Regions:
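Short phosphate-binding/catalytic loops that engage adenosine nucleotides
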Residues: 1, 21, 85
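Conserved active-site-proximal phosphate/metal-binding subdomains
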Residues: 34-66, 71-186
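A structural preference for short, pocket-lining loop segments at secondary-structure junctions
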Residues: 14-29
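A short linear-motif detector with a strong N-terminal bias
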Residues: 3-4, 163
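Short, ordered loop/turn segments at secondary-structure junctions
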Residues: 8-9, 28-30, 93
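Surface-exposed amphipathic alpha-helices with a cationic face
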Residues: 1, 8, 13-17, 54-62
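A cross-family glycoside hydrolase active-site/sugar-binding cleft signature
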Residues: 4-6, 27, 66-68
Length: 186
């Protein structure tokens, strides 16, 4: 069994390699949903873009590096490989596939979402994640919004709203995770 360690900083990559990781998955801030990091507070503070992160990690470790976050089409794949990645991981780009079984409302929103149409928020779960800029997500980061409870309390507090929004195909209440490049996927 091979161990793939998802990281968001060079120091995490070095620590993962020292701990025995066989492959490092470098996740840039462009990625949708929660960040895969050993230290969530470091990931929140650093927010490093993929094309800065990949070459820095490739230079720092001696195991294969997979680029993740913001890759959704052949141009992104070629760029990541040129920067030294051995492979890429595509997330949001595959959410529009039938096998993902997300709502048509969410899939259609991803198709028309520009990079600036995403937002980073703790509102859904208490952990920082990138979502489509829905009414709830935008309201959650306003100056008047209460500070979200920590994970998993916030996740439990928003469960009914998220479940109902999904049943009703109401994007504005959904946990509509999406990366910044999702609309590039065909």
């Amino acid at each position: 069994i091979k161990w793939f360690a998802k990281v968001t900083t060079v120091s995490e990559a070095i620590s993962a390699e020292e701990a025995g990781a066989d492959v490092i998955v470098a996740q840039g801030m462009e990625a949708g949903g929660h960040k895969g990091a050993f230290n969530a507070s470091d990931a929140d503070m650093n927010m490093i873009g993929l094309f800065s992160l990949v070459p820095a990690i490739c230079d720092a470790v001696n195991v294969p590096v997979v680029a993740s976050g913001g890759v959704a089409d052949p141009r992104g794949i070629a760029a990541a490989l040129t920067l030294g990645a051995s492979a890429v991981e595509i997330g949001t780009g595959f959410l529009r596939c039938p096998e993902a079984a997300i709502s048509k409302t969410w899939a259609d929103a991803i198709a028309r979402t520009k990079p600036e149409d995403t937002i980073v928020t703790r509102a859904f779960s208490g952990r920082l994640g990138r979502s489509i800029r829905t009414k709830y997500a935008v309201a959650s980061v306003s100056d008047e919004a209460p500070i979200p409870a920590p994970y998993p309390i916030q996740r439990n507090l928003t469960k009914t709203m998220r479940d109902n929004a999904s049943k009703e195909n109401n994007l504005d209440g959904m946990q509509a995770w999406a990366g910044q490049s999702g609309s590039l996927a065909q």
